[in-house]
């Protein structure tokens, strides 16, 4: 697991190496570490291991939207397993640190993204805020909780991307308050075409630790699903709104 030394003084990143120079009392201290890149398969394996993701084509789940789905994702479960929690936190930090090095602060999406955003901000030593789905109906009526200054570059942390609608609404709230949205990182994405189109239209780069294709491939390798079930799972992803099982 890498150790982060955060400095605006000097920073170089490439595929597998990070070099950071920290200036302290006229002396330069240089740190090196080497690591593998974000492992989508390893993240998917851990989510399956703790049943954070369940696959059941025979008895589909019903989402809040009314969609029938052969998959259910509950990334909140990872918070209850310390070693997996640390792994996911570090992977989030790696993505943010490498892909969005200019971010001034992080913003968590309420509610599931709040914990992950706070943990990543703590490890990266960045300021942190979180965004509610709507303004509070009492007190100060805040929709964004925490201190921020307009013009700052903010990275949004989310746990799950389905259609992307609610996640992008958060980006809109941040932009309306004068913040620059650098991008969004999520633990898992279903990879729906509608989500890809929405993020592209909004001009918000999206990164995820793992995705639907990786998950299905891994489930097939492990014998969790068979070839017939794989076809069902892939067909659902093509047209989830009209899929009936």
Predicted regions and their residues:
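Short glycine-rich phosphate-binding loop at a beta-alpha junction
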Residues: 102-110, 185
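Short hydrophobic targeting helices and cationic amphipathic motifs
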Residues: 5-7, 11, 24-25, 34
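PRPP-dependent phosphoribosyltransferase catalytic core
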Residues: 38-49, 172-245
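Active-site-facing substrate-recognition patch
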Residues: 38-99
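Short, glycine/charge-rich flexible loops or terminal/linker lids adjacent to PRPP-binding catalytic cores
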Residues: 117-155, 163-169
